Amino acid sequence: MTLLLSIILLASCTKTEIEYRDVEVPVETIVEKIVTQTVTQTVNVVTPPEEYSFTRNGVSTVYYTGQSARLKMATAIKSAMNDQASTKTNVDNMFNNGTGFSDESLNSSGKKIGNKVGTSGSATVKPLFDEWITEFTTIVAPAVNNSITATRTIAGSYTEADGSRTVKVNAKGFELNQILSKGLIGALQVDQIINTYLSFTKLDGAKQDNDDDIYHYPTDGSAVPYITKMEHYWDEGFGYLQGLDNQYAPGLGDASIGRDGANLNYYLNKINGQEKEVGITKRIYDAFSAGRAAIVAKDYEERDRQANIIGVELSKVIGYKSQYYLRSAAGKIGKGEWADALHALAEAYGFILGLQYTKAADGQPYLTHAEVNEHLSSLSAGDGGFWDRTPAELTTMADQLQQSTGLSE
């Protein structure tokens, strides 16, 4: 019994060995192959020219004769509004019908100013110009012809004691040719440039035609159209600034071709001489050139960027000059130089009217129509109007405009 048990126990303790062998197993490997493919894409790159010159098939596509005509009309109307021989019928025809000018080319141009005044804003602005024409020709001019000396509440002519200046004014001291001509700088030129021809609504309305290269306008003397609507709209905006000056360079051209102080570009170049705005004429000119090149390249984002530059920079002319002439008038009143003071106040009045057509960096005008009217009412308050103003009042108003525009010389 004992022997058998021992055998069983020994059998239970026997060790089992495990044999390991190397076995070849197939492995699937995934390899990514990078393939480089060259894709050619045509991109229009905007390269603005150094001068405002654009051609197609060897023919110029720049065309703004209508704007040049209107600027010449503005100059002639300014002169007529200082001529006591002018009649209401004559000046009204010049302004509203585009006739009655000594320059026959203007009479036959088919252009006029009246229907282009203040078109982007309140309908109450254009009638002001008609009222000024009526008042000068029916009240001021007859008073001057009758040798009436102007004073508070009395229309006529007023000459500085030293004979340096004579102004022809209404009963409130308004020198109406200055109010009208400076008013046109904002309500005609700035408004047409910023709020009409360079507006995104106007330009984008011609986008499809520009994309499809559909030409609508011939260059002068050509029967074949070479110009798209959008190109022409941009040129018209350019023409309202540069129409009496050199197309191929910023700044002022030869005065012999009709340039006058009734012109926006004339005052822009005055601003260019200020320390803070040196180079503003070239900035605006280059923006016009770059924007036009962008239209040719169909780069509308770049076009809009340049339009914004033009709007903001051009508006500075109205912003600076509106406050400048208020301060100038304050100084002249302080010296008792009333002819100079009335002249400066008329210029201030016209420029303030234009503030509603400006475009600040935020896209809004410096002043709304209502805010402009508040300033104009303050400036003309009382029976004596300009005659009643004090240096303190004018300085306060200039300070307010400086704050509204963010501009200081």
Regions found by a protein language model. Give the residues of each.
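Mature extracytoplasmic or organellar-lumen-exposed domains after removal of signal/transit peptides
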Residues: 43-409
